[in-house]
Amino acid sequence: MNKFLRHSLLLALLTGALSGVANAQTDKLIIESGDNARTRQDAAMDKEQWNDTRSLRQKVNKRTEKEWDKADVAFDAKDNCEKSANLNAYWEPNTLRCLDRRTGRVINP
């Protein structure tokens, strides 16, 4: 019986000690919708930066499109030059032109 009493007392002490640690103060509840002054300010700054870089993005896109068009035209010109019936026509890869072997002048096959 004495042993049972000691174990019960020890269990009661441990339960009391642990229950004090496990209790949390839950009388306050904070709910944020995510729509506060900081997020609105961040969104406004992001929009302003996006608008400020608009012309730069347009320039980059135009340049990319221009380079792609140039490569596309050169590919077609090379294809036409290589398929040409003119035996003196050859494709110059450095200048991206079809030239005459004898004169070195540009020819249109």
UniProtKB/Swiss-Prot annotation:
Keywords: Signal
Signal sequence interval, chain numbering: 1-24
Basic and acidic residues biased stretches: 38-55
Keyword Methyltransferase in annotation: no
InterPro entries tied to this protein: DUF1283
Domain of life, source organism: Bacteria
Region (Disordered), start-end ranges: 38-63
Family of the protein in this entry: Belongs to the UPF0482 family.
Entry-linked HAMAP family: UPF0482
Listed name of the protein: UPF0482 protein ESA_01750
Organism encoding this protein: Cronobacter sakazakii (strain ATCC BAA-894) (Enterobacter sakazakii)
